[in-house]
């Protein structure tokens, strides 16, 4: 759906049936921007999601915004896993979040490699790489 519609979409996902706490709700959205190569196409970032919450949870008020772009940015801000830096625009913030996610996956792969490695000298090398990756991830997360 997101690829077909050329406007930002905020998805509300529902899980379960019936009444009460069995029904859960999650909000998901992806940042959309026009493609640099083809103006008729849109480029999607990865999806940002909220936690699953009971459907009976009280809804928060919509943020105040002067136009739809600012409203969508304010709604995305609540779903982002990292805080915004001062003077950081939404596209830069999205790029930093995606870079941090890639770095996190790289840390997990390196940790798995460290566990599988048997030779001590290779473990020392992998551990040094792991420390560098973790410090880079920490820099991105601030």
For the regions a language model picked out, list residue spans one by one.
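Selected N-terminal structured segments and early membrane-anchoring regions
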Residues: 1-88
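Short, charge/polar-rich alpha-helical segments
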Residues: 84-98
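Charge-dense, low-complexity intrinsically disordered segments
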Residues: 62, 94-97, 120
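Non-transmembrane amphipathic alpha-helical segments
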Residues: 96, 100-117, 133, 137-140
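TerminUS-proximal long segments
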Residues: 124, 139-142
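Short, charged, amphipathic alpha-helical segments
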Residues: 120-131
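Long, hydrophobic, amphipathic alpha-helical segments used as structural scaffolds
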Residues: 83-86, 118, 141
């Amino acid at each position: 759906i997101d690829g077909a519609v050329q406007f930002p979409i905020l998805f509300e996902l529902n899980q379960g049936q019936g009444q009460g706490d069995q029904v859960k709700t999650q909000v998901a959205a992806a940042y959309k921007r026009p493609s640099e190569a083809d103006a008729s196409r849109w480029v999607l970032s990865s999806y940002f999601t909220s936690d699953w919450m009971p459907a009976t949870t009280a809804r928060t008020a919509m943020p105040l915004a002067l136009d739809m772009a600012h409203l969508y940015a304010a709604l995305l801000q609540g779903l982002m896993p990292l805080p915004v830096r001062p003077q950081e625009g939404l596209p830069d913030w999205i790029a930093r979040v995606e870079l941090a996610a890639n770095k996190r996956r790289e840390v997990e792969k390196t940790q798995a490699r460290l566990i599988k490695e048997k030779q001590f000298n290779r473990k020392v090398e992998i551990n040094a790489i792991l420390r560098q990756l973790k410090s880079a991830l920490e820099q991105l997360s601030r």
